[in-house]
Amino acid sequence: RGNTSSMEVQIDHVVALSNAWQTGAFKLSIKERTAFANDPMNLLAVKGRLNSQKGDGDAATWLPPLKSYRCDYVARQIAVKIKYKLWFTAPEKEAMVRILKSCPEKALPTS
C-alpha cells in the first residue's frame, strides 16, 4: 500500500466489525474480539470502492457485484459468524438462504 494504492485496495472484514458488534461480538472477551478482527477467514483484499459501498452491511444490504462469487462470500460470512457465535438477523438469513439456493453443494470454509 502506498499513497496511490491505499484507496484502490483495502482490507474488507467479511463480517463487518459494526455488524459483528450488533450481532453478539459485544459478548466476546477482548482477546476473542481481537482474534475476530484479525482472523484471516474474515479478511479479504478488495477494491476500495466496493469496501466503501459495503460499509457495515450484511448479506441483506450488500453482496459482491460479481454474482459468481456470492456463494463463496455468503458461506464465508456464515462460517465466521458461527465460529464467533454471532447471530443472524431475519433479513440477513433470508438473503443468505436465497443466495445459497443457487449453490446447495457449497461447503463452509474452515480456515
Q: Language-model segments: which ranges?
A:
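Domain-level detector of nuclease and nuclease-like folds
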Residues: R1-S111
